[in-house]
């Protein structure tokens, strides 16, 4: 337990929250451990008075798998996956894809002139935080893996439609599979992939949301939140998910899988 920094959609909310959490460090059985964290959260909820609420489940892994199948250059796939959690910047990236501003002939021609000029410069010279050598490598990648102007609009449409998917949890697999089939994306999701398939647990309605899980950068798989209504107020009382890279990102030389959750106090 202790204080944690959390961004909020409501500007009136404090970014510092007192929380009590629980986690499985060194998670070996992903699906069962994910389910265990949600089950523990639901058991803890029994001690709280509320009239109704919702359990929303998402999965970052599904988004990243879908992005990996889209017909866009590798650098764009990495960019979209990396910035999924930064909603405003992510939307800016989609706009660039949709309008093809990054492949505008005038801008490309200017870039080519800069490229030819930089070829004559010191490769170790630093420009805007990057060495000339790094900048030249990035430009070479663009030349070898160009993005067709006609593809951007269609890819953006697919991503936006995917992020709109929200349904009762027992329909999650069928909704996703219909979407993948419609857009000719080579992916299939089994309903057992999700930690729960019951649409109602106690007083909670259970949903799948494709866009949920963008609040924190470190989530890598299953994510969830529990919102309750108490005294006519909607309260986000619990949230959590899987973070298989966080411990190594913090300096561990060994990859340690983990999943956890926290209650707001």
Task: Label each residue range with its predicted role.
Residues 71-103, 228-230:
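Acidic, His- and aromatic-enriched active-site or binding-groove loops in soluble protein domains
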Residues 55-58, 77, 190, 209:
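Residue-level detector of family-conserved "landmark" positions at structurally sensitive sites
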Residues 50-51, 90:
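Intrinsically disordered or highly flexible coil/loop and linker segments, enriched in small
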Residues 1-50, 102-265:
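Positively charged, Gly/Ser-enriched RNA/tRNA-binding surfaces
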Residues 46, 64-73:
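Charged, amphipathic alpha-helical linkers/stalks
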Residues 1-7, 54-65, 83:
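Short, glycine/charge-rich beta-strand/loop segments that flank catalytic centers
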Residues 51-52, 74:
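A short alpha->loop->secondary-structure connector
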């Amino acid at each position: 337990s202790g204080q944690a920094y959390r961004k909020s959609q409501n500007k009136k909310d404090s970014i510092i929250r007192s929380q009590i959490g629980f986690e499985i460090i060194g998670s070996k059985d992903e699906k069962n451990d994910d389910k265990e964290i949600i089950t523990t959260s639901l058991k803890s909820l029994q001690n709280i008075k509320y009239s109704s609420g919702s359990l929303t489940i998402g999965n970052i892994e599904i988004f990243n798998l879908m992005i990996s199948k889209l017909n866009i250059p590798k650098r764009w796939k990495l960019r979209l996956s990396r910035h999924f959690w930064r909603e405003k910047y992510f939307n800016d990236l989609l706009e660039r894809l949709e309008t093809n501003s990054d492949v505008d002939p005038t801008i490309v021609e200017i870039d080519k002139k800069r490229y030819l000029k930089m070829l004559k410069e010191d490769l170790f010279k630093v420009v805007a935080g990057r060495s000339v050598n790094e900048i030249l490598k990035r430009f070479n990648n663009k030349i070898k893996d160009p993005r067709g102007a006609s593809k951007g609009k269609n890819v953006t449409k697919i991503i936006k439609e995917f992020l709109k998917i929200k349904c009762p949890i027992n329909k999650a697999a069928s909704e996703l599979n219909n979407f993948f089939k419609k857009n000719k994306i080579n992916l299939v999701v089994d309903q057992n992939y999700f930690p729960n398939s019951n649409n109602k647990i106690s007083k909670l309605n259970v949903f799948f949301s494709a866009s949920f899980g963008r609040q924190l950068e470190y989530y890598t798989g299953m994510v969830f939140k529990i919102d309750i209504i108490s005294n006519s107020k909607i309260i986000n009382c619990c949230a959590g998910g899987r973070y298989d890279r966080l411990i190594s990102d913090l300096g561990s030389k060994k990859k340690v899988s983990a999943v956890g959750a926290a209650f707001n106090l």
